[in-house]
Regions:
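N-terminal redox-cofactor-binding region of secreted/periplasmic oxidoreductases
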Residues: 2-10, 14-689
Length: 689
């Protein structure tokens, strides 16, 4: 039996171990030990596991690919040893995270020479195993006679990325690219050098390894608007709903939540569950919304308004990223090759403007390779790295490319429509409820049984969607308020968000994590636009990211956030909130001291200090009805270049009324069907529009 086949056979059993502490079948266990070269003893196995995970914190030595995916999320049959092992790993991460050295370039991928070796020919090459790339590689490799190469710069998911509540700690591991924006003038003013963090995930699963896990599709109006802009009815809500449902495995774990069963998928590959349990503070937040006439709803019902416990990408309390969902179960496919620790530097385009393959650098061998695609190349690097790769390949704004000496293959507005949700992080409240604090070992034991604090994405326990003055009466959600436990503001958050020491101390430095919560205010349909540009023609430099948050000339974005602040304050003034003695924690920012506390001018100043990235960038390789207005056609094909598509968040020309992961996975499902149809393979759905 191959190593990959053994992995698949034990992978499903692992889920049971992690949730209930049950044991592996002896034959699977013995096969596993044999294939990794460990004798059949508990002590030897645990020593082997520690050797593998000692490298978790070390970017200098990429791990062996075979051992790495065996060690991923794999535990001993002895439950108490599992608790000891994972407790130690969590404590190591928490201890090392503050001093962990994150990358600031792609230097670790630089080859020793410029010689390029042949890597072979495949039917399809997918660059990037993120939210859409993992889906595309998985769906295309379902066709057994298609050879699919998936190029990924990072590693497989592991034990830490499996823990939903460790999302912030994962920012201080090799799963984070550690991008940051150029200095800003209209937002991020409380950050170091006025530069926002721009976190993107690196690994099989991409940013679904590092995000807050919220699964929200947005409004039917988003997709009908998209269909209208693209002049392609196949993107209408009615026609894309089957793709949402195809990927989803919805498990309504909160039986008291409002659920519309008909809009959900059951039995798909991507887990979706409700956030549990509800704290008394969250219950009061929901009651306050009810008191003001807002509906308790299933926000994935197509309308997208109302409040609810967060629907999140977990399965049995474990993070269910797209790598775990779409790639890990299928590593035994002989026609799917996953090339880890490999960074694509150029798309090969011939003189007839046909994409023929990809050049990539392998961090393990320190060599360059050339892989060819007989059918198509699909770029899935995300909203920052897809435009970077296209521009390095000569596809992009002519003036920008020529200024860097890059020959222009196709003049397109790549990187010129960076859009993002603008999120305000500055509302803190204390209550009379104190959250009990358990020792790490107790929390780990609960997690391994599928219960407790670690099974919940700590960044977002509940959400509420509202109309703004710009959408009132339309049912179009334009404001989101997220209910966040105060432990999301710990010292790691200061570093992760790049807050200055003064800003952090004035905002979050004196918060009692046990009795407080924060409300994040998110402007959904933003007008501010930024750019992604190359620093140089050197592919090993990070891109220049300039989001220009809150910069729209009409000030719609900041006005929308201000309106969200007013909604939040009105919620705090309800009977439901008074029952828990809610009180705003007023720590005036020195930067806004010239304004009367809580005046409109004060809030506008405060918003510019404390608004930054929600890590939802879109639009940099936007679909459009013509090449004059965008980068891709409605089938995600690059205008003017044959055999080349983009599939990730960058394809959406505007932000939606929900978090983007659901739409990104849907786009991956949809483009896979389009490709399969183009080459005569069976499709899941196809609407001619």
């Amino acid at each position: 039996m191959s190593r990959a086949a053994v992995f698949v056979s034990v992978f499903l059993a692992v889920s049971c171990i992690e949730c209930s502490g049950s044991h592996l079948d002896d034959s699977d266990w013995n096969s596993f030990l044999k294939n990794v070269g460990v004798d059949n003893s508990e002590d030897e196995f645990m020593n082997w596991r520690r050797r593998q995970d000692d490298n978790f914190f070390d970017d200098r030595t990429p791990l062996d690919e075979g051992n790495r995916y065996f060690s991923s999320r794999f535990y001993s049959p002895d439950f108490e040893r599992n608790v000891d092992f994972l407790t130690n790993m969590v404590q190591q991460l928490q201890d090392r995270a503050p001093s962990y050295s994150l990358p600031t370039s792609y230097e670790q991928y630089m080859p020793r020479s410029s010689d390029v070796s042949d890597f072979g020919t495949f039917d399809f090459i997918v660059v990037g195993a993120g939210g859409a790339g993992a889906v595309v590689a998985s769906r295309l490799s379902e066709i057994s006679n298609w050879r699919v190469l998936l190029i990924e710069a990072g590693d497989y998911p592991d034990n830490i990325t499996a823990i939903p509540n460790m999302y912030l700690q994962v920012d201080f591991t090799r799963y984070n690219w550690n991008f940051a924006t150029v200095p800003q003038t209209t937002a991020c003013l409380g950050m170091v050098d006025r530069s926002c963090t721009a976190i993107r995930g690196r690994g099989v699963g991409g940013t679904t390894l590092t995000n807050g896990l919220v699964y929200s599709r947005g409004s039917f109006l988003d997709y009908n608007r998209l269909a209208q802009e693209l002049n392609d009815n196949r993107w209408s809500y009615q026609n894309i709903l089957p793709y949402f449902k195809r990927s989803e495995d919805f498990r309504p774990t909160d039986t008291t939540a409002t659920t519309v069963p008909s809009v959900h998928g059951y039995g798909g590959l991507l887990g979706v569950e409700y956030h549990l349990p509800r704290s008394p503070q969250l219950q009061a937040f929901f009651a306050a919304n009810n008191e003001l006439g807002y509906q308790f709803s299933d926000y994935n019902d197509g309308i997208g308004l109302g409040h609810s416990p967060a629907q999140v990408n977990t399965r049995g309390g474990m993070t269910h990223d797209t790598g775990t969902a779409f790639i890990m179960p299928f590593l035994n496919r002989t026609n799917l090759r996953v090339q880890l620790f490999s960074y694509a530097t150029q798309i090969i385009i011939d003189k007839n403007k046909v994409a023929r393959g990809v050049i990539f650098a392998d961090a393990k061998t320190k060599r360059l390779y050339r892989a060819f695609a007989s059918k198509e190349v699909i770029v899935s690097g995300g909203s920052y790295q897809s435009p970077q790769l296209l521009m390095l390949s000569g596809i992009g704004p002519r003036e920008h490319l020529e200024s860097l000496g890059i020959p222009v293959r196709q003049d397109l507005p790549i990187g010129s429509n960076l859009r993002n949700h603008n999120c305000y992080y500055g509302l803190n409240f204390r209550t009379n409820y104190t959250e009990p604090i358990l020792p790490t070992r107790n929390v780990v034991e609960q997690f391994l049984r599928g219960q407790g604090y670690y099974t919940t994405p700590g960044s977002n326990q509940g959400v509420a969607f509202y109309e703004s003055q710009y959408s009132r009466g339309t049912t179009y959600p334009d404001i989101e308020i997220m209910f966040i436990p105060a432990n999301a503001t710990n010292e790691l958050a200061r570093t992760s968000y790049r807050m200055t020491n003064q800003t952090y101390q004035e905002m979050w430095g004196n918060i009692d994590f046990t009795n407080s919560f924060i409300l994040y205010i998110n402007a959904l349909h933003t007008e501010s636009r930024g750019t992604v540009r190359l620093r140089s023609s050197n592919p090993y430099e990070y891109p220049l990211i300039d989001p220009r948050f809150l910069s729209d000339p009409a000030n719609k974005d900041i006005t929308t956030i201000f309106e969200g602040v007013q909604i939040a304050l009105s919620l705090m003034n309800t009977t439901a909130m008074r029952k828990i003695d809610v009180e705003i924690q007023s720590h005036p920012l020195t930067a806004c001291a010239q304004y009367r506390l809580f005046s409109d001018d004060y809030w506008y100043c405060h918003i510019r200090q404390m608004t930054w990235d929600l890590y939802h960038p879109v639009g940099t390789c936007a679909m459009s009805a013509s090449p004059e207005t965008g980068v891709l056609d409605s089938e995600m094909r690059v205008w003017g270049i044959r055999g080349l598509r983009v599939a990730d968040a960058s394809v959406f020309p505007f932000t939606f009324g929900g978090h983007p992961v659901a739409a990104i996975v849907m786009a991956g499902e949809r483009v896979s069907d389009l490709i399969r149809q183009d080459y005569g393979a069976p499709t899941a759905f196809y609407s001619s529009g």
